[in-house]
Regions:
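Active-site-adjacent beta->alpha loops and helix N-cap segments on the catalytic face
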Residues: 117-121
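Conserved small/polar residues in nucleotide/adenosyl-binding loops
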Residues: 124-126
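Metal-cofactor-binding active-site regions of metalloenzymes
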Residues: 2, 10, 47-48, 71-89, ...
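Short, flexible loop segments at the rims of nucleotide/cofactor-binding pockets, characterized by
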Residues: 16-17, 112-115
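Active-site gating loops and adjacent loop-to-helix segments of metal-dependent hydrolytic enzymes
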Residues: 6, 40, 94-105
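HAD-like small-molecule phosphatases
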Residues: 103-109, 122
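An N-terminally biased module of ancient metal coordination in phosphate/nucleic-acid-related enzymes
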Residues: 1-74
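N-terminal Rossmann-like or analogous alpha/beta NTP/dinucleotide-binding catalytic cores
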Residues: 64, 91-92
């Protein structure tokens, strides 16, 4: 049986996940050992500490893919982000500055504010 990790912070030095490439590769080796075939990399965006723009994330994913190939780590990596819900969220998703889930433009992984759920949340459709 294979598994998909749909929320992962293995991109090195980009948010509060992997501190460096060595740690990122170690995390993905463990994923491979645990029969995870696909990893959707979802660094934080707009959460007050991190603003990882889409093209920077795409570049980081490509760098990590290359490192995985060089280290014989056979896990398929997919681009994404964990977008903190702010007044900028919809605009950034529509413009492409924030990444959608798997970079397909169909859905987004949204991180809700820690202390409240915004009014009108159910009305958000892109």
């Amino acid at each position: 049986m294979k598994f998909i990790d749909c929320h992962n912070h293995s991109l090195p030095s980009i948010d509060d996940g992997a501190e460096n490439m060595t740690m990122a590769l170690d995390m993905l080796r463990i994923a491979q050992k645990d029969h995870i075939s696909d990893v959707i990399l979802t660094p934080h965006h707009l959460n007050g500490a991190f603003k990882n723009h889409a093209n920077e994330v795409r570049t980081s994913v490509e760098t990590l893919r290359t490192a995985c190939i060089q280290n014989n780590i056979q896990v398929d990596l997919h681009v994404g982000s964990e977008v903190h819900l702010t007044h900028e969220t919809v605009e950034q998703l529509v413009s492409g500055e924030a990444l959608t889930y798997c970079d397909h433009g169909q859905a987004a992984l949204i991180e809700l504010p820690k202390h409240s759920i915004p009014l009108g949340l159910s009305l958000i459709h892109i």
